[in-house]
UniProtKB/Swiss-Prot annotation:
Identification of the protein by name: UPF0227 protein YE1706
Organism whose genome encodes this protein: Yersinia enterocolitica serotype O:8 / biotype 1B (strain NCTC 13174 / 8081)
Lineage: Bacteria, Pseudomonadati, Pseudomonadota, Gammaproteobacteria, Enterobacterales
Stored Gene3D superfamilies: alpha/beta hydrolase
InterPro entries the record matches: AB_hydrolase_fold, UPF0227, UPF0227/Esterase_YqiA
Source superkingdom: Bacteria
Length: 180
């Protein structure tokens, strides 16, 4: 089973396309939506829904995948739920770059500080990060610098921030998922 978390643009038709692409890896792809506006509520909601999906799915090698803001959540929720994660262009600093778009961006700082200390060290090698060299929204070099000590970084030369085409990376994701 693969859990898919959308980015800030929850209504983008690209989300459906990504789900269809991920079904080439596993036919059981679950799209879990969240508000994107209320971080604390989103975290509680995502923990509950992802845990429920894992319990119902019966796949010992479940995976959570997210793009942009969904990548922020995939890394944290996947860690807390004990499943591997794939993050495409994860937005590691929504409190800095989403002011005016979300109600309480400072809640992201609170969430980050309340997460288990050194969670990335404890999560080492359990997240695959795919970054666009042409990310028009985020500084992918900064993201790579923050995550490279803990996770494998795969660079994509063609995609933009929303990462419309996952297909060049599906085999790598499938291999990563089988590691459980």
């Amino acid at each position: 089973m693969i859990v898919y978390l959308h980015g800030f643009d929850s209504n983008s038709p690209g989300n459906h396309e990504k789900v269809l692409q991920l079904q080439f890896i596993d036919p059981d792809v679950r799209f879990i939506s969240y508000s994107t506006l209320h971080p604390r509520h989103d975290m509680q909601h995502l923990l509950k829904e992802v845990d429920k999906a894992i319990q119902q799915g019966g796949d010992a090698k479940s995976l959570i995948c997210g793009v942009g803001l969904g990548g922020f959540w995939a890394e944290r929720i996947g860690f807390l739920c004990g499943i591997r994660q794939v993050a495409f262009n994860p937005n590691l600093y929504p409190q800095d770059n989403m002011s005016g778009k979300i109600d309480r961006p400072e809640e992201y700082v609170d969430i980050a500080s309340k997460c288990i200390s050194d969670f990335r060290e404890k999560n080492r090698d359990r997240c695959l990060v795919v970054l666009s060299r042409n990310d028009e929204m985020l500084d992918s070099k900064r993201t790579a610098g923050d995550l490279h000590p803990y996770y494998e970084i795969v660079w994509d030369e063609k995609q933009g921030h929303k990462f419309k085409d996952l297909s060049p990376h599906l085999q790598r994701i499938k291999a990563f998922k089988t590691l459980g």
